[in-house]
């Protein structure tokens, strides 16, 4: 049996989920992922595995999800998020998710083709989403921050604990 090395652990009644995201942009669009189960888009990326750095993890996730190697341009955002969701046992619980979002260098010969599936086997789809979309995207700060990229790393807190 394969060992699960994902840095996602139960903590009391909640979950700590440490992840990375790839910021892949082109012509005022960002490459996002969607699936048939959820009604929102999410960033290319996933959980850091134990023993990986965030940089190693984002490169691995890009390779797994896109079937393509990309180099990192820079760390764009560190985001601490608290939200309610389901992971693993499908029971809704509070999730604390520190995430590192990296701007990637998009090669000239990059072609869009999704290579991944969800844990339940359903496919994921890649789509270029306009920065100013009305669609629901996570992380939400992509809608405001990607229009005006900075060379500095930004720290963001997204706290949805009071939403429930």
Q: Residues of each region from the PLM?
A:
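A generic structural micro-feature
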Residues: 14-16, 90-98, 118-123
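Acidic, metal-coordinating catalytic segment for phosphate/diphosphate chemistry
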Residues: 1-21, 27, 91-92
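Conserved Nudix-box catalytic region and its N-terminal flanking loop in Nudix hydrolases
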Residues: 29-65
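A short coil-to-beta-strand element that immediately follows conserved catalytic motifs
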Residues: 69-78
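Active-site-adjacent beta-strand/loop module that shapes the phosphate/pyrophosphate-binding cleft
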Residues: 83-113
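Acidic/histidine-enriched, glycine/proline-rich intrinsically disordered or flexible terminal extensions
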Residues: 147-164
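Conserved hydrophobic "DFG−1" position in protein kinase catalytic cores
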Residues: 24-25, 32, 104, 128
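NUDIX/MutT-family hydrolases
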Residues: 103, 115-150
């Amino acid at each position: 049996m394969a060992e699960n090395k994902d840095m996602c652990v139960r903590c009391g009644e909640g979950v700590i989920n440490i992840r990375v995201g790839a910021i892949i942009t082109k012509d005022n669009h960002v490459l996002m992922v969607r699936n048939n189960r959820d009604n929102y888009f999410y960033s290319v990326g996933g959980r850091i595995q134990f023993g990986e750095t965030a940089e190693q993890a984002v490169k691995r996730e890009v390779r797994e999800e896109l079937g393509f190697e990309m180099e990192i341009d820079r760390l764009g955002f560190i985001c601490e998020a608290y939200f309610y969701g389901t992971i693993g046992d499908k029971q809704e619980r509070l999730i604390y998710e520190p995430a590192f979002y990296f701007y990637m260098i998009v090669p000239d010969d990059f072609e869009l083709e999704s290579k991944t599936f969800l844990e339940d086997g359903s496919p994921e789809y890649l789509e270029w989403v306009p920065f100013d979309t009305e669609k629901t995207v996570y992380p939400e700060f992509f809608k405001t921050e990607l229009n005006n990229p900075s060379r500095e790393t930004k720290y963001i807190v997204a706290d949805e604990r009071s939403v429930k």
